[in-house]
Amino acid sequence: MEINPYLMFLNNDVTSLISTTYPYTGPPPMSHGSSTKYTLETIKRTYDYSRTSVEKTSKVFNIPRRKFCNCLEDKDELVKPTGNVDISSLLGLAEMMEKRMGEGFFKHCVMEAETEILKMHFSRLTEGRQTYDWTSERNMPAATALQLTVDAIKETEGPFKGTTMLEYCNKMIEMLDWKEVKFRKVKTMVRREKDKRSGKEIKTKVPVMGIDSIKHDEFLIRALTINTMAKDGERGKLQRRAIATPGMIVRPFSKIVETVAQKICEKLKESGLPVGGNEKKAKLKTTVTSLNARMNSDQFAVNITGDNSKWNECQQPEAYLALLAYITKDSSDLMKDLCSVAPVLFCNKFVKLGQGIRLSNKRKTKEVIIKAEKMGKYKNLMREEYKNLFEPLEKYIQKDVCFLPGGMLMGMFNMLSTVLGVSTLCYMDEELKAKGCFWTGLQSSDDFVLFAVASNWSNIHWTIRRFNAVCKLIGINMSLEKSYGSLPELFEFTSMFFDGEFVSNLAMELPAFTTAGVNEGVDFTAAMSIIKTNMINNSLSPSTALMALRICLQEFRATYRVHPWDSRVKGGRMKIINEFIKTIENKDGLLIADGGKLMNNISTLHIPEEVLKFEKMDEQYRNRVFNPKNPFTNFDKTIDIFRAHGPIRVEENEAVVSTHSFRTRANRTLLNTDMRAMMAEEKRYQMVCDMFKSVFESADINPPIGAMSIGEAIEEKLLERAKMKRDIGAIEDSEYEEIKDIIRDAKKARIESR
């Protein structure tokens, strides 16, 4: 009999089947090597989508500066993306949005943000992850980058005494006017010494903390530089993308703009940010149900699951400046000034090009890297692909940075771009009213859903085209190939599938159902708590939850090699366990980790198995399992849970403390042999590790630190303790000599037994 795969569609709805197509079972692919190519592609796309050649020479940097707003020249094939924003249309949309939300809506939001900003401490900037550090010109953790910037102020002008975000912002604006900036930098000095034995000269590198200084022009470029790197962990894509991290001089201003935008997003019912999880689902459900109330009896809706092409390349900082000017028009002068700084800095940004371009000869036997600074000099060596990327941008490149007045890089101003997107969803004009059409939707950064409402199909077509035209005016390009329309209440939004209600995407949670590998006590309880959480969220039906529980049990038994006492499974561990089980009368009270059977079902998922089996245990067995003085008994408050996407989730540990709650420790003692031989061995290991790390930059390798048997480690420790006791006078010399003799005899016996 042949199996027909289409039978799956009979029992399952389409939206739940979509979730099975995600390849979430393995780890996502990592990106290796130089990010220069991806960065050049992003910059070239931004210049191409401007569809204009209007340029002026920048007075500050003496580089040609392209205009990205109000100057659309190339009007051919407008289906393709365009990044030229019409400012008057943008302000008109913002006005419509304020009218719909009520008079003084923006003013109220900015006042809320202002009270928060005035209290904000500048240490909030340490929350970020990797940040570009302008002193060393590479990425650092956010806290380190902030400390180095504060140190630079100290070296140039004296200690920085401010505490609030505003004082820090003022200092940054002052810094941009300084004629010279001094900062700390680690330099390596080469020291030469002669070896007494061999007479050879030995070179050693010594790190020395020095003070460096740069002039105003150089500092301006460094302050406005945004570093780029290739994005890690992207599924289903052959080409990588570049993501960006700004420096500590731009960060505080963008933080302020995002705070203002967040207050606006919280009050917009079409916005998918800043809430998440179940709260987000409830907000979206309200928007969908309110649509039905607005529709007349002769109207019908079509849902469009939209996809915006090249969102970041078509966003313009100049447009953001105009939008923020409108938002803060009735606010205090302080907020007007503060909100205008970030877009102005982004209008003059420099993008760091990365490590450079790798070239090889025809036979692929030799490889060479052309650094970013020398690309202009050696462009005759480049392939056609790289030449076409580099030559149009050559006039904008200075050393290893490129001037980019337009466009946003990934991860900047997520909230503000959502406000921009929602403003298109609030649009209404006389022509739409006359035809009895309107639209609404949901927006979350570059992801959107459109609900188009009309009375017949031709009007629906016209409404969607109208929406597309409104979006084009402010640089939002709806991709006609990737967007698709469907019947009402059937769409996908930010990986959430909606079909009358939200359908679970179980594939995301699959890795969390497996054995965590902490210890026998915690693992099964953790898996049960995940199944329970997913049942509460409507992600698992009762039958699927039961199946998941059985799979967890099988994997738990396979991991710890413990099988039911009557299963007759043979194995080294089962031999020992079976001998111990013979002494127990009531075998129903045995824990799973001791060869017992599963007692939990779906209704008792929240109760740990130790509690369920407590009454059935033999008294002697119970006293052994719950013995607080047992050295294996240990309790951790939290437990780490791995998921297919996103960071590791930390949850509360609900497991009962028993003798199975042990914690394994690593033996980190050093090799007690001739030091020289060990050093040589370590050097070889270190070399291999370094080679591997240089190829796979995101690999996490712990370099080996030698090996030592436990016997040697104990002997070494005993001698050390005895010597210390003798030195403080706790034991006499004769006792110390006796201890040494005993250890020597033990060492001999150990070596002979080998």
UniProtKB/Swiss-Prot annotation:
Keyword line: Eukaryotic host gene expression shutoff by virus, Eukaryotic host transcription shutoff by virus, Host cytoplasm, Host gene expression shutoff by virus, Host nucleus, Host-virus interaction, Inhibition of host RNA polymerase II by virus, Nucleotide-binding, Nucleotidyltransferase, Phosphoprotein, RNA-directed RNA polymerase, Transferase, Viral RNA replication, Viral transcription
Principal subcellular localization: host cell
One Gene Ontology CC term in the entry: host cell cytoplasm
Subunit: Influenza RNA polymerase is composed of three subunits: PB1, PB2 and PA. Interacts (via N-terminus) with PA (via C-terminus). Interacts (via C-terminus) with PB2 (via N-terminus); this interaction is essential for transcription initiation.
Family: Belongs to the influenza viruses polymerase PB1 family.
Listed HAMAP family: INFV_RDRP
Protein name, as recorded: RNA-directed RNA polymerase catalytic subunit
